[in-house]
A protein has these predicted regions:
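C-terminal scaffold of the Radical SAM
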Residues: 1-132
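Radical SAM enzyme core and accessory elements
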Residues: 93-183
Length: 183
């Protein structure tokens, strides 16, 4: 028909739960859009949501909560060949000045993708002995995401008892990993 369908969803709205967001994502997937945008709710000064936050009738989604949920959503859309073209608000405009609460981070998508890699690495490593060093290969372009912002994923692997080196592999697809013993 000469056009593409792009849909948007928000997480962390009043009365929202992770389960409701997953249901929303499933409904969006059923519509077979070409693209999706996902925006965690943030609270800005001088808005009704700011009043609800102050009177206790609304609790803003934390950054960690939003990262965990949006990482799941990102994988859901990817598994259905739907491109997520935006994940989180970009800085600028009134966001920086009026921000009160909610999941706002200038590198929000990177945090979500880092979470995906961390969960995959920990899941695979949990099947292996902890007393040996490993090499974890990830897509070449995703080394930074796999290591995590400020190397948080590398630290988490170490805190879980795994000594790992993360290296690039140009033949792996997004979010795929390969673990071998470091000889």
């Amino acid at each position: 028909y000469g056009f593409s369908l792009g849909l948007q969803m928000m997480t962390g709205l009043m009365g929202d739960t992770d389960e409701k967001c997953i249901k929303t994502a499933e409904r969006l997937i059923a519509l077979s859009p070409d693209t999706v945008r996902i925006y965690p709710t943030i609270v800005l000064e001088n808005t009704p949501l700011a009043d609800y936050l102050r009177d206790g009738s609304y609790r803003a989604e934390t950054l960690n909560e939003a990262v965990s949920l949006c990482a799941r959503l990102l994988l859901m859309f990817r598994e259905n060949n739907i491109k997520v073209i935006r994940l989180g608000l970009h800085s600028g405009g009134n966001v920086d000045e009026g921000y009160l609460a909610g999941a706002y981070h200038p590198a929000f998508r990177e945090l979500c993708e880092g979470k995906i890699y961390l969960e995959k690495m920990l899941s695979e490593l949990s099947k292996l002995p902890k007393d040996m060093p490993y090499v974890i290969e990830v897509p070449e372009k995703s080394i930074g995401k796999a290591k995590g912002q400020n190397k948080r994923n590398e630290k988490a692997l170490l805190n879980n008892g795994f000594q790992c080196k993360i290296k690039g592999n140009e033949f792996l697809n997004d979010y795929d990993i390969k673990i071998t013993e470091d000889i």
